[in-house]
Amino acid sequence: MKKDTIAAISTGMTNSGIGIVRISGEEAFAIIDRIYKGKEQLSQAESHTIHYGFIKDREETIDEVLVSVMRAPRTFTGEDTVEINCHGGTFVVRKVLETVIKNGARPAEPGEFTKRAFLNGKMDLSQAEAVIDVITSQNEYALRSSMSQLKGSVKRKIEEMRKEILYHTAFIETALDDPEHISVDGYGETLQTVTEGILIELEDLIRSSDDGRILKEGIQTVIVGKPNAGKSSLLNVL
């Protein structure tokens, strides 16, 4: 995994009240120290604090900002992170990003912040996938499903099954190594019950995945009927 420091605009590229430029990586604090002018040096600031000041490119003042300082590992990516809250005009946000890149960061690739969060153990694959699902949710049900996955509902189920499998695998291996002291009488029935239970849970997960896809993508439906049969009324109800 690359250890360089990345930066990107975290808000939409339209004129708005506020724009955010995020920096993540080992050099995040060194970079912000080069371009931020305020009451204190942000590399010395406490984690999870916000500071008022200005972003400067040499002697030129770019914008008046609030800067959030977050130290690893208690961040989204698991790395040192800085978020620059500036005015949301597209030009000024891009100018702030250009200044950050000029001072040592590189432009983040699409999805790279989430990728780093995954690689640094801040989330598992199901949660990483849920991030984009939350962003692209088109209805309340899809959002609720995606948020549940992001909060770890799928992860917990998989982890419980994994623990169950590891427990019984360890028991079987121990029994094979020491058959004189470990009895396996009746264990076959227990193992069968456990295995069947895990298979049912896996089938439920697969089924819920299919249901989730319908919630997120919807169902293509055609309403067909004779003229004045009530097709429009039915569509309006739906």
Where are each of the predicted segments found?
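Conserved G1/Walker A P-loop phosphate-binding module
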Residues: 15, 22-24, 34-39, 171-238
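A glycine-rich (often HGG/GG-containing) alpha/beta subdomain
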Residues: 1-144, 148, 152
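Long, non-coiled-coil amphipathic alpha-helical linker/lever segments
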Residues: 122-201, 205
